[in-house]
Curated annotation (Swiss-Prot):
Matching SUPFAM superfamilies: FdhE-like
Gene Ontology MF term list: ferric iron binding
Cell location: Cytoplasm
Chief site of localization: cytoplasm
UniProt keyword Cytoplasm present: yes
GO BP terms: protein maturation
Functional description taken from the UniProt entry: Necessary for formate dehydrogenase activity.
Protein name per UniProt: Protein FdhE homolog
Domain of life: Bacteria
Family in the record: Belongs to the FdhE family.
Length: 309
């Protein structure tokens, strides 16, 4: 995959003609506000009401820390140091990017926001993370970003990921946004940070009918044609599943070639769908898919595997 920075002349020329934006960058404040509202709405009378409420509180903590302690400009992302070639190679690749220690400052702030609301179980997790050394927390983060989930407490992973995601989301705001993909390679991971998607979202409005995959880490969305499997690019054996009806706003797209699946959210059927919240709230669809022998290809920041299970 390559990402090319457009000169101003091309940007202006393209503005007057329809095109499918290759990348959609999140507005951090709006993203968290929408997520909080959606979690609140979906939690009403839901079998997992308590956990959805907890997830909403984590998003509230992320929003509060974003507003109170925004990170400074990273000098590595200055225009002088970040070339078009750099942008073409997953510029914020989660396993290559050397994290600034500020991510741990964000983590401590998120834990402080959560502490007054925490029940005994959550409080124990928070206090354990607080007692760890910086090196221990960095080690957990390394394993988490490498998807070595079997070595990590799923309860701790939620908070570590929340801080990492808040850090990466702000880094994305610091790179040029006037860029686009020139090839369709490796679209099963985020072209910015190389992380897995949460779900795909079928847009309405200006991007009517276009499919975008939503990154679980940096929250960027990237365009991928709907005729391909999001995991293996094959086209011949795609099926769609839902729990209630054919016009459901949340479906699972499965692939008979790689035997994986990823949720698809349809804004036309419910304009309020939100990648992380709706994916988590539709967990019973995941159960159905796993019973069919299919493996989830996406990653939800509130659904890490439990190594003790």
């Amino acid at each position: 995959m390559s990402i090319r920075i457009l000169p101003d002349s091309e940007i202006k020329a393209a503005a007057s003609s329809f095109h499918a934006p290759a990348l959609l960058f999140a507005n951090p404040k709006n993203l968290y506000q929408r997520r909080i509202a959606r979690f609140t709405s979906l939690s009403n009378a839901h079998p997992l009401e308590d956990y959805l409420h907890f997830a909403s509180q984590v998003a509230e903590a992320q929003l509060a820390v974003l507003q109170q302690q925004p990170i400074a400009q990273d000098p590595r992302l200055s225009a002088e140091k970040l070339s078009a070639e750099d942008l073409a190679k997953q510029p914020l690749n989660a396993q290559r990017w050397q994290r600034d220690p500020v991510w741990q400052t964000l983590l401590m702030a998120i834990l402080a926001e959560m502490k007054p609301k925490a029940n005994e179980t959550i409080l124990n997790t928070i206090e354990t993370l607080e007692k760890y050394s910086k090196a221990e927390r960095d080690s957990i983060a390394d394993k988490l970003l490498a998807q070595e989930f079997e070595q990590i407490s799923s309860a701790q992973a939620v908070f570590i990921w929340a801080a990492l995601s808040l850090y990466w989301l702000q880094l994305v705001q610091q790179i040029p946004h006037s860029s686009h993909k020139e090839s369709g390679e490796s679209l099963h991971v985020c072209p910015i940070c190389a992380s897995a998607p949460v779900t795909s979202v079928i847009h309405f409005g200006a991007e009517q009918g276009l499919r975008y995959l939503h990154c679980a880490l940096c929250e960027t969305e990237w365009n991928m044609v709907r005729s391909k499997c999001t995991n293996c690019d094959q086209t011949g054996k795609l099926d769609y599943w839902s729990l209630d009806s054919e016009i459901a706003a949340v479906k699972a797209e499965s692939c008979g070639d790689c035997h994986s699946y990823l949720k698809a959210l349809y804004q036309e059927r419910d304009p309020k769908v939100e990648a992380v919240a709706d994916d988590l709230a539709s967990i019973f669809l995941d159960v159905e898919m796993e019973e069919k022998g299919l493996q989830r290809s996406g990653l939800n920041p509130f659904l890490f595997p439990n190594p003790e299970a």
